[in-house]
Amino acid sequence: MSIYLFKFEFKNYFIIKTKSELLIDNSKSSSSLKINVDLTMHRIPCYILNMDISDFTGAHTSNVKGTLTKTSLDANGKVLSEDKSALGQKHEDKFTTEDVIKAFNESQGCRLTGSFSVMRLPGNFHVASHTFAPIIRQFRERGENIHFNLTHTIHHISFEDEKDVSLIKEKFNEGIMTPMDGFYLVDDTQGSLLNYYINIIPTEYQDIDNKIYQAFQFTYKQKKVDSGRMIPTIFFRYDISPMKMKYTKYYPGHFDGLINICAIFGGMFTIAGITDSILLKIF
């Protein structure tokens, strides 16, 4: 048994361990936050779909720019040829009312992919059609049945540099970097507001070679409410924690290893002494 424990301790000495700490985030970080999104709305066409953002200060931006693109999909989720446009451009000028009605009748969808930056403040980004409210009102006045089906798939959401996120996931097992990836929700009711509440936690990863990676992990919860008179919308409401998680890779220290080995031998001699005393009393 002692030999086994000695071998285990000796082998354990060469195993890289990870220490976690919860600290106050007093780092001088950037004033902006990059958000990476890949989202499919399965039953709302690209013609009347936008990504909007607003923050704690009340600032609101419609039809955000960045690198976001919209790709039209057919009812089976296949890409419609040559139908791709950047958000922030005058895509809304490139269609007719007949195009929109046809897209709804064909159950077309839309995939939004790319990145954009927001102020590093509590806020939200939302997938919505209220920018096109006058057009939607016109359709309804004509008696056209515009059905807002919010069924969607979140292929990917992350924060800051995508390359760093991928690298950290390869090097570390700790943290929750992309918990929403692959999430699918069916919602074919016409009067819903879907809210995702996201708690973002600044995180620092220190590799065994002391190289440091900055990232953001996050958790979320989802809640559905009645939209009332609003156009059905999906909100991603985020808040940034004042605390920071730190993960540090390290080898066990020489002193700790020596103490454990001494404890093994000490235990071995103690057991041997007790056994010897028992045998002397018996015999």
Region roles according to the model:
Residues 215-283:
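Membrane-proximal extracellular juxtamembrane segment immediately upstream
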Residues 1, 13-19, 278-283:
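Helix-loop boundary elements of multi-pass alpha-helical membrane proteins
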Residues 5, 15-18, 96-99:
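Eukaryotic beta-rich interaction modules
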Residues 7, 11, 38, 42, ...:
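Amphipathic alpha-helical interaction motifs in eukaryotic regulatory proteins
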Residues 9-33:
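Alpha-helical transmembrane signal-anchor/signal-peptide segments
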Residues 1-7:
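Hydrophobic membrane-insertion alpha-helices, especially the h-region
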Residues 29-31, 38-226:
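Soluble non-transmembrane domains of integral membrane proteins
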